[in-house]
Design a protein with these regions (language model features):
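Domain-level signature for soluble enzymes in the chorismate/prephenate branch of the shikimate pathway
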Residues: 1-273
Length: 273
């Protein structure tokens, strides 16, 4: 997988500062409140941001941004799709997505796929929940009953680092990788999370440049910020951090499927910066 072929070189104003320890870093103005998911998949985009970052599970992170308690956050895609027009500006060129098996977002099932009747949904990320509904309902023509985590179910949705831990501990179980299933039916990558900004245009534009620079640094240092061989494989092979034409087409396709099944009222017009 080629890393970030779509992004231009950093502008001079976005140059990183070299810290005493020898590692570069990007300093976001102290007045800007930054949030991110706490998972490994966000590390390349956040590792070189020197400013404080609130790290929250996806659902809570989205709620904090929506409430105005954060100015920018690496939120699940559904937060942007469900919000009124002009609520957010999306930082262009960078996102958390996958071109193939993402490994950390899947359905773990105990009966043949076609016989799934009940699914326990992880409420932590609405994007993954909605993607699971698309794959089971639209692609596989199933109508399972969705239940809360912990209830008896034929399948369960797991995401993020807990999903990685479970999968590594139980390799013999059955897994439906949601990014793989999406690609098989659409031919497109899937975008799980984006940087969403709630600031005036002039502030958002400057911040977007800083976030892109931090992200480029993280992607170029992936081997160094990976603590294990698996983490290196996960960050370089399972994830894609581009937000280019194909990813934007995938976002539009996902939004259209949610409108068709009445999970979204209308296809939103997104603003990239």
């Amino acid at each position: 997988m080629k890393a970030l072929s779509l992004v231009p070189k950093p502008k001079p104003a976005d140059k990183a500062i070299i810290e005493p320890g020898g590692l570069p870093s990007i300093h976001i103005p102290a007045a800007i409140r930054v949030g991110s998911v706490p998972y490994l998949n966000a590390r390349p985009l956040t590792r070189f941001i020197a400013s404080p970052i609130a790290k929250l599970e996806p659902k809570k992170l989205a709620a904090e941004l929506r409430a105005g308690k954060l100015d920018v956050a690496l939120v699940p895609l559904m937060e942007v799709l469900e919000s009124p027009a002009n609520t957010y500006r999306i930082v262009d060129e960078l996102a958390i997505g996958s071109e193939r098996a993402v490994y950390s977002v899947y359905l773990n099932y105990s009966v043949p796929l076609a016989k799934i009747k009940t699914v326990a949904l992880d409420p932590a990320s609405k994007t993954s929940v909605e993607l699971a509904r698309v794959i089971l309902g639209k692609f596989h023509r199933l109508k399972p009953r969705y239940v809360a985590p912990g209830e008896p179910a034929d399948a369960q949705l797991l995401i993020g680092d807990p999903a990685i831990t479970h999968r590594q501990a139980h390799p013999e179980q059955n897994y439906l990788d949601l990014a793989t299933a999406w690609r098989e039916h659409t031919g497109l990558p899937f975008v799980f999370a984006v940087w969403a900004v709630r600031l005036p245009y002039w502030k958002a534009r400057s911040l977007a440049g800083q976030l892109r620079t931090a992200g480029r640094l993280g992607l170029s240092w992936r081997d160094a910020i990976a603590h294990t061989p698996f983490e290196r494989q996960y960050l370089t092979e399972h994830l894609c951090y581009d937000l280019g034409p194909r990813q934007k087409k995938a976002i539009e396709k996902f939004a259209e499927t949610r409108v068709q099944t009445e999970r979204l009222a209308t296809t939103p017009k997104l603003s990239y910066i």
